[in-house]
């Protein structure tokens, strides 16, 4: 599942960041910010117009991401999210 498809307040684990093009600067920057395999992530909120931007929390840090940026991040929903 892509991070952009994750419902709000559902915990997930990052599986990886996909490069849209070779040497993708945005994907590289997302990895530098901490969107790496094994990190827990969740969408905290979404903007009022077109649900943009997404307020995403990874660890104790929050980032505002466009949906197109969040769509590059592959996640797996944590099993305890539905327990």
Which residues are covered by each model-predicted region?
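Small-residue-enriched segments and motifs
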Residues: 1, 12-15, 41
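Cytosolic, membrane-proximal regulatory domains of ion/volume homeostasis and mechanosensation machinery
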Residues: 1-3, 75
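Short, surface-exposed secondary-structure edge patches
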Residues: 3, 30-34
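Short, basic/aromatic beta-hairpin or loop at an interaction surface
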Residues: 8-21
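C-terminal structural segments of small proteins and small subunits
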Residues: 10-12, 48-83
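Short alpha-helix capping/helix-loop boundary micro-motifs
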Residues: 23-29
């Amino acid at each position: 599942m892509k991070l952009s498809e994750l419902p709000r307040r559902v915990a997930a684990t990052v599986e990886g960041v996909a490069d849209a093009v070779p040497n993708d600067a945005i994907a590289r920057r997302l990895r530098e910010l901490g969107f790496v395999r094994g990190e827990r992530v969740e969408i905290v909120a979404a903007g009022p117009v077109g649900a943009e931007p997404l307020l995403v929390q990874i660890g104790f840090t929050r980032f505002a991401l466009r949906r197109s940026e969040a769509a590059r991040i592959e996640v797996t929903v944590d099993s305890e999210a539905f327990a």
